[in-house]
Design a protein with these regions (language model features):
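A short, structured loop/turn motif at beta-sheet edges
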Residues: 41-44, 93-99, 119-128, 165-168
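Short Gly/Pro-enriched turn/cap motifs at secondary-structure boundaries
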Residues: 27, 80-82, 107-109
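Hydrophobic ligand-binding cavity/cleft-lining segments
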Residues: 5-71
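Beta-strand/loop substructures that line and gate deep hydrophobic ligand-binding cavities in soluble
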Residues: 105-158, 163-166
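N-terminal Lys/Arg-rich, disordered targeting/topogenic segments
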Residues: 1-2
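Extracytoplasmic/periplasmic/luminal assembly and interaction segments
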Residues: 53-104
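Short, surface-exposed coil-to-beta transition loops
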Residues: 33-35, 85-90, 112-117
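Extracytoplasmic/secreted envelope proteins and their assembly/folding machinery
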Residues: 44, 48-54, 67, 89, ...
Length: 168
């Protein structure tokens, strides 16, 4: 077998693989809803203060390398989460201290988008925080990666772990 023929076989195999992944992604739903919950060792006021103060995220969210706080628009907090080379514009769309906070991805050019709804309930010795992600994944290949590699709830689980560590 010549090098050219071997190269063509490799390229054809990769093309078929990409086509299969894209086909599977097109069969997966664009939208999803995922929920995670945790009991945290702080009262609802302290938990709400931590999740609503996006300017302090970089100090305790180890998954972020920086947070760029932007000027509010229509009274809504806006910021950019920076993680390595990735930048995700965010905004708060609903704020009801200390019970509920809703944030959303504010960049329509990303292959994904959606909201996180934080619901806080007082509990014995702390707060029960529930995060509900209502997401959409526009790119079929990214749907496959999100569903089968990362999992829809991975970022929420990381957030809850970081918040728990921050609150002590």
């Amino acid at each position: 077998m010549t090098i050219v023929r071997a190269g063509l076989i490799v390229l054809a195999t990769l093309a078929v693989l990409v086509a299969v992944v894209a086909g599977v992604g097109m069969m997966l739903p664009r939208d999803h809803v995922e929920t995670r919950s945790a009991k945290l060792p702080a009262d609802p006021d302290a938990v709400f203060a931590a999740i609503a103060d996006v300017g302090s995220y970089a100090a305790w969210r180890t998954s972020l390398s920086a947070v760029e706080v932007l000027a509010p628009v229509n009274g809504r907090a806006r910021w950019v989460d920076v993680s390595g080379g990735d930048r995700i514009a965010m905004e708060q769309v609903e704020r009801q201290p200390p019970r509920r906070l809703v944030t959303r991805i504010a960049d329509p050019d990303l292959p994904f988008g959606g909201t996180w709804t934080f619901e806080l309930a007082p509990g014995e010795g702390g707060t029960r925080l529930t995060i509900t992600e209502r997401g959409e994944i526009r790119n079929p290949i990214f749907r496959v990666v999100s569903r089968f590699v990362f999992g829809y709830g991975a970022t929420m689980e990381t957030f809850l772990d970081e918040l728990r560590a921050h609150l002590g």
